Amino acid sequence: DYLRWIFGDFKIKYVINKKISDLKINTDDFLCLTGKFKKKIYLQLNLNYFTREAKRQILIDGKDLSISANLINKNMIFHDKKKIYKIKYNFNRDYTYKEQHRNIMNKKFTNCCTLKDAQNVMSIINKIRKFK
C-alpha cells in the first residue's frame, strides 16, 4: 500500500511468497518481491513475520536522494546532494487504525481509499498468490 501510495501502480517481476516458519498462523510469513514502477523506478519489497527484531522500514534510493523511514522508531532521514535532514515524528502507532475504525462506524468516508484503489491492491495480492 505504501509503495502504491507514493509511486503509483507497479508491475511485478519476481516473487517468492511462502510459509517457512513454525509459527502457528494460517498465512504465508515470507515475501520477497521485485518489480518496476512507471518511469523506470524499481522496487524490492521484503516482508517476514518471524524476525525477532520488530522492523517497519522504508528505504528509497535515487540518483540525488536517499530516504530512510523507520516506522517503529518514528523517524525519517533524507539525504540529498548537500545535506542530511533528520525528522522525528511524535505519533501513536495505533492512531490511524483507531481513526479508521471510528470513521467507518460513524460513516465518515472522506479519507478512505476508493473502490478502485481497493481493487488495485487486491489485484496485486492475487498476482503475488499466482507466483507460488
Model-derived regions, located:
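Phosphate/oxyanion-binding loops and surfaces in catalytic or ligand/nucleic-acid-binding neighborhoods
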Residues: I6-D9, L33, S66-I67, I128-F131
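NAD(P)-dinucleotide binding in Rossmann-like oxidoreductases
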Residues: D22-D29, K39-R102
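Generic low-polarity alpha-helical segments
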Residues: F10-K13, G62, K74, I128
